[in-house]
Amino acid sequence: MSKLWGGRFTEEAEAWVEEFGASISFDQQLVNQDINGSIAHVTMLAKQGIVTKEEAEKIKIGLQYLLEEAKQNKLHFSVEAEDIHLNIEKMLMEKIGEVGGKLHTGRSRNDQVATDMHLYLKEKVEHIIKAIKQLQTVLVHQAENNIETIMPGYTHLQRAQPISFAHHILAYFWMLERDVNRYEDSLKRINISPLGAGALAGTTFPIDREYSAELLGFNGIYENSLDAVSDRDFILEFLSNSSMLMMHLSRFCEELILWSSQEFQFIEMSDQYATGSSIMPQKKNPDMAELIRGKTGRVYGNLFSLLTVMKGLPLAYNKDLQEDKEGMFDTVKTVEGCLHIMAGMLETMTVNKEKMGQAVTQDFSNATEIADYLANKGLPFRQAHEIVGKLVLHCTQKGIYLIDVPLATYKEMSALFEEDLYEVLSPYAAVKRRNSAGGTGFEQIEKALEKAKGLTKEAIKN
């Protein structure tokens, strides 16, 4: 097969060399974006008088035909045509004849592929934002159902203070909200057009870059043609944002895995999101949560892979940039899948309120309450801290908990202790009292839920 760029060459490459250099096996995912970009480009060429209206109309009819074929998965791509751009151009010329060769006037594959990826990521980032909002809605529903479900809060994976389960869930809501904000902000840099930058230096044809950008829904154009064809910051930013999102999902999955274990028994996964063992019939494994945790690593890898590709590239385009796509495609697929699984997993899990309640009555997570009790009576907090530390030591030696210590023993430690101390030791009361802004107090959770619901409703409207 003769190449569309073959005029300079006297020998054809070996088949295995062609296969090594071809990208059609993966960049065919850009087929819709490539055709839509071409439709906008030829429309602009006609407006500027670079091609005739009749030629443009014939080209657009051919492109529309290919677009419909693509939507029905009827296009057949070839390695010999290398990439999505030359495959489409070859098919177009087979369909409408030599006039199809005018499509590439005033354009290079360098600005063409960059345009395709901007269009692709714009669409996918908007989808991901919607998927995050759906997950946030699930979190809000779970939080609403568990405002007064008391559980241990942890530091160093040691029981620290009693908190509301709703408060714990909403922590992830706000992590995800930051992820949404980052993705939304990245759209400012994704939604600009490199089309018309040419190979690197622009073009001698009197093109109208702003017009083609407007046709494609971009908010503006790259100001520098070298930057336009060599920039992959927008992909790196997407991979970085996705890495942070996956880190948040992975942290939550780690907790779900722990909570579903026999050692915790705080939650039970739905059978839909768990698997069994081929040898141990009693097992119910949290495989979906483990997979999300594991897939986080591949998204990190995609980010570092492209950073490494980019770090030594001189301006402008280099073939190394062919390596920018597979990690991007893989990350989109991974993130979309993980968000979908995460939402279903959280929506269908069963919360074991009784086990959570037992965990905060058979521990020392109420120790801070006693220290605060003494501090509220005028004792310096550091002295109160030391007294309570001795009380905890006394309890561990006796095999009892703070609620079991008689008042007389408390009074031996400090005359400030009174009968009302035992009200303070209630985990429910401890949670209720923590009513500072952003705290686990029930009033604060209600306020947080109102804000969270407002954000999810606003997203649904948009």
Curated annotation (Swiss-Prot):
Pfam families: ASL_C2, Lyase_1. One of its GO terms (biological process) is L-arginine biosynthetic process. The keyword Cytoplasm applies. This is Argininosuccinate lyase. It comes from the Bacteria. Its EC number is 4.3.2.1. It is found in: Cytoplasm. Pathway: Amino-acid biosynthesis; L-arginine biosynthesis; L-arginine from L-ornithine and carbamoyl phosphate: step 3/3. Transmembrane segments: none annotated. PANTHER family: ARGININOSUCCINATE LYASE. Signal peptide: none annotated. Keywords: Amino-acid biosynthesis, Arginine biosynthesis, Cytoplasm, Lyase. It catalyses: 2-(N(omega)-L-arginino)succinate = fumarate + L-arginine. GO terms for cellular component: cytosol. Belongs to the lyase 1 family. Argininosuccinate lyase subfamily. The gene is argH-2. InterPro entries: Arg_succ_lyase_C, Argininosuccinate_lyase, Fumarase/histidase_N, Fumarate_lyase_CS, Fumarate_lyase_fam, Fumarate_lyase_N, L-Aspartase-like. One of its GO terms (molecular function) is argininosuccinate lyase activity.
